[in-house]
Amino acid sequence: MSSTMKPHNEAMRMQRWTIVMLSLLVSLAGCTEADDLVGEEPVVTNEEPLVNSFPIWNGTDHANTTLDSSAFANRSYLAYFSAPWCAHCESTLDAYDSIIPNGSIAIFSMEGREEYANMSEWHNQTETNLNRTFDRPFILHPELAKEVRVQSIPHAVFVNAQGYAFHVEIGKETNLTYIQEVWSATETAFFSPENGWNNHINNG
């Protein structure tokens, strides 16, 4: 046998020994006392389906009207997050506006910088760019956007009548058929801890 094989065999034996020791350590992990090995029974967990309540909010819209989440109590609505500088978001807002009933959209600006704080200007700019009237509240609310963890816009949260975030749509969406399906599902969506959601959305 060549002398060059001997170091190789030694290395192989050390590797095997290391693997055996690691296996023993893993098997003992979490069992540091004798009591840990006695009387253990299977742990049964009843995990509830995940659901998030949409935060309670209040603010003043572009017409200086005070508005809060209680105005949408016991009915579905769309919380739409964007910013005045997001020109490409307008086509999505236009699509949502054509489907969602009057009084069922709240438009929030996530932009906290002072030069974008005028909601009346944003509202007028939207009407000019879309070439039509736009009767929805525009509300400055970067704090709510942070609470909802808005990172990309447009960011639309479909809130059901229980106040739960039923569906979140991020990015451009102009498929009116899909938006109608999501809205219809939101209006009939109900969450129970025992059964979860009664409706589900297939992403468009």
What is each PLM-predicted segment?
Residues L140-E187:
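Thiol/disulfide oxidoreductase modules built on the thioredoxin-like
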Residues M1-L50, G204:
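Secretory targeting signatures
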Residues T188-G204:
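Short, low-complexity, Pro/Ser/Thr/Gly-rich segments in the mature regions of secreted, periplasmic
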Residues T60, D135-P142:
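Short acidic-hydrophobic, aromatic-tinged amphipathic segments that line or gate anion-handling sites
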Residues L67-E90, A106-F108:
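Short active-site neighborhood of thiol/selenol oxidoreductases, capturing the structured segment around
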Residues N58, N64, N74, N102, ...:
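N-linked glycosylation sites
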Residues A73-Y77, P101-A106, F134-R136, I153, ...:
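Loop/turn elements at helix/coil->beta-strand transitions in domains of secreted/extracellular proteins
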Residues E90-N129, L140-E147, W197-I201:
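Structural microenvironment flanking redox-active thiols in thiol-disulfide oxidoreductases
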